[in-house]
From Swiss-Prot:
HAMAP family: FabH. This is Beta-ketoacyl-[acyl-carrier-protein] synthase III 4. GO terms for biological process: fatty acid biosynthetic process. Belongs to the thiolase-like superfamily. FabH family. Catalyzes the condensation reaction of fatty acid synthesis by the addition to an acyl acceptor of two carbons from malonyl-ACP. Catalyzes the first condensation reaction which initiates fatty acid synthesis and may therefore play a role in governing the total rate of fatty acid production. Possesses both acetoacetyl-ACP synthase and acetyl transacylase activities. Its substrate specificity determines the biosynthesis of branched-chain and/or straight-chain of fatty acids. The last Arg residue of the ACP-binding site is essential for the weak association between ACP/AcpP and FabH. It holds the Pfam family ACP_syn_III. It catalyses: malonyl-[ACP] + acetyl-CoA + H(+) = 3-oxobutanoyl-[ACP] + CO2 + CoA.
């Protein structure tokens, strides 16, 4: 048993292809002004047909491991949050473990769509605390370009592809936990408000319902997540929300009240990458030096199933 765990490194990966608003204007009835005014997105990255989601995840995971100074043999748990897995089995976590050469890990996928990474992080934290794992690799990865209808201007303008990863390790004796208690839940009666359904599977949502829920119900829940770590929103150095769209991120962040925090706005450049959005944004903040080791950051995912999960972490 351990008193707690912490994130020791992060990493991210995005495909090379950039799809601009102008590109989309040549595909559907839209414009750069229309997209920016409604969702605040300028560009997004799109993976090619030869770039499966486990490849995106593998690249991000490898970067996180390298940043932590670890080898694949040091990992005994792989948790991947994704809703765009290639197959039901083998799962994405097993595919990532195989790509990286991780010997004999527990490997599991979690499908909680846009709230997936914070659920996965809590799962890894619990496993390390219980002594069931010593080092965990937690990945959020999605290839949303495969599940969007590219003729539907209300959804195709939103999505992007990518992956982000974190290494989770046990705290040293006497060290304060670096991952706070998770606050999670769902609104199952509204689960159809965000969905990936049909054959082939397609992403759809009730945009106004999601907006109202996110901007009216979630601020209080996010503040409660801070309270569980013994902090006030004003104590936060960073707020990393699921990057749904800028018109949700900005009012939600403002209502949380983290007046001293940098607010991740990676959605402007990356679009909505579902489970990848939080670790992708966190890794970029670290890469740019906008957060430093030990800074308290609120990670808060929300979306499909109308699920949510949030926790305060200490930045690596």
């Amino acid at each position: 048993m351990h008193q707690g765990s912490r994130i020791t490194a992060v990493g991210h990966y995005q495909p090379a292809r950039i799809l601009t608003n102008e590109d989309l204007a040549g595909m559907v009835d839209t414009s750069d002004e229309w997209i920016r005014s409604r969702v605040g997105i300028r560009t997004r990255r799109i993976a090619g047909p030869d770039e499966p989601v486990d490849e995106l995840a593998g690249h991000a995971a490898a970067k996180a491991l390298a940043s932590a100074g670890l080898t694949p043999a040091d990992v005994d748990l792989v948790v991947v949050a994704t809703s765009t897995a290639i197959d039901r089995s083998p799962n994405t976590a097993a595919r990532v473990a195989a790509r990286l050469g991780i010997p004999g890990p527990a490997a599991l996928d979690l499908n909680v769509v846009c709230a997936g990474f914070t659920h996965a992080l809590a799962t890894a934290d619990h496993a390390v605390r219980a002594g069931s794992a010593s080092r965990a690799l937690v990945v959020g990865a999605d290839k949303m370009s495969e599940v969007v209808d590219w003729t539907d201007r209300t959804t195709c303008v939103l999505v992007g592809d990518g992956a982000g990863a974190a290494v989770v390790e046990a705290c040293a004796p006497g060290e304060e936990p670096g991952i706070g208690p998770v606050l999670w839940g769902s609104v199952p009666e509204m689960g159809n408000a965000v969905r990936i359904e049909g054959t082939p599977p397609r992403f759809a949502q009730e945009g106004q319902s999601v907006y109202r829920w996110a901007t009216t119900r979630l601020p209080a829940i996010a503040r409660q997540a801070c309270e569980r770590s013994g902090l006030e929103p004003a104590d936060l150095a960073a707020v990393v929300l699921h990057q749904a769209n800028l018109r949700i991120v900005e009012p939600l962040a403002a209502k949380i009240g983290a007046v001293n925090a940098v607010v991740a706005r990676d959605v402007v450049e990356s679009g909505n990458t579902s489970a990848a959005s939080i670790p992708l944004a966190l890794s970029k903040l670290a890469e740019r030096g906008e957060i430093t080791t030990g800074d308290p950051a609120l990670l808060f995912g929300f979306g499909g199933n109308l699920s949510y999960a949030g926790q305060v972490v200490r930045c690596p």
